[in-house]
Amino acid sequence: MRSVVIVTDAWFPQVNGVVRTLSTTKAELEKEGYQVTVISPDGYRSVPCPTYPEIRLVLFASKSVGRRLSGLQPDAVHIATEGPLGLAARRWCRAHRFPFTTSYHTRFPEYVRLRAPIPISWSYAFLRWFHGPAHRMLVATQSMENELLSRGFKNIGRWSRGVDLELFTNDSQHQRSKPPILLYAGRVAPEKNIGAFLELDCVGTKRVVGGGPELKALIEKYPEVEFVGYKHGPELALEVRQADCFVFPSRTDTFGLVILEALASGVPVAAYPAPGPLDLIENGHNGWVSEDLNHAINEALKVDRDACRKFAERFSWEKCTAQFISQLRPVEAN
């Protein structure tokens, strides 16, 4: 098996964990000698997704995607998203009895429910239909697997995540700021639940790195918060490294790459007990999870930074990509 097609509705120029995961996996696969083709919205007619304009929804893609897959004749197909491109690839694979894998990157039903009065049960029914024929539905954590199993999903496999340990580094000489810097970094959008952090009455300087549809409203509502916009690469790594506590208020993520990036930088994490944080954060060791986010922050500030870094060193993109490869279903195995 040497050629892999990844089909995704989420791709550059979007800035999010899904794109980082897929682009890094593509690079790691290519380092291993694989020929990787990404079928993304690039080159297709598309419209902005309502409430999330950075995502482009491709129009009338079914025949075009089918022609591309027929022409490529890949050894394996991975469908990363449940959008129009994912649906088109799924349709082609089913019609040609071509085995495929899928992955689950976002708690889609909960995400949709935040924006529209669609019952969560309807969304999960759609997801069971979408992922049901896959050889494997890949998830990042045990808690996410347990949740999906309880909702009737089957054929679930593990695909964890990694972190760039050379970019995100721990400052062993770090001295806590007075007051401490409490950092959120990521997309500024309703599903990230940032307001739960910003409205806290806690001791510390609240700092937000990132942008998104909720940014303007939050700037107006919380004038005391430092909003610094998007940061990338070394600038992002510096922002994270200088923080005293990383606050992750989301309840809809399935992993949270930024958690690993914070830990690799020696920064303890405070979060709610949701999938992702529950799998990565050990209370008192590298952060704290609690339904009382203020309490979680206070406890996380007591954590040893070197222990955070040591925990993150267990994760690498090489290991994650090996996991991904092991779950693929080559066509000759059908």
What are these regions (language model features)?
Residues P99-T101, E110-W129, V139:
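Nucleotide-sugar donor phosphate/pyrophosphate-binding loop at the beta->alpha transition
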Residues A125-D171, S177:
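Donor nucleotide-sugar binding/catalytic pocket of nucleotide-sugar-dependent glycosyltransferases
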Residues H131, Y230-K231, L238-A243, F324:
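Short alpha-helical donor nucleotide-sugar binding micro-motif in glycosyltransferases
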Residues H174-V209:
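Conserved donor-binding/catalytic core segment of Leloir-type glycosyltransferases
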Residues K216-P234:
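Nucleotide-activated donor-binding/catalytic signature segment of Leloir-type glycosyltransferases, i.e.
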Residues R251:
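Aromatic "clamp/platform" in nucleotide-sugar-dependent glycosyltransferases that forms part
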Residues I259, A264, P268-A271, I281:
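Short hydrophobic beta-strand element within catalytic cores of glycosyltransferases
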Residues L301-E332:
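A charged, aromatic-enriched C-terminal amphipathic alpha-helix characteristic of glycosyltransferases
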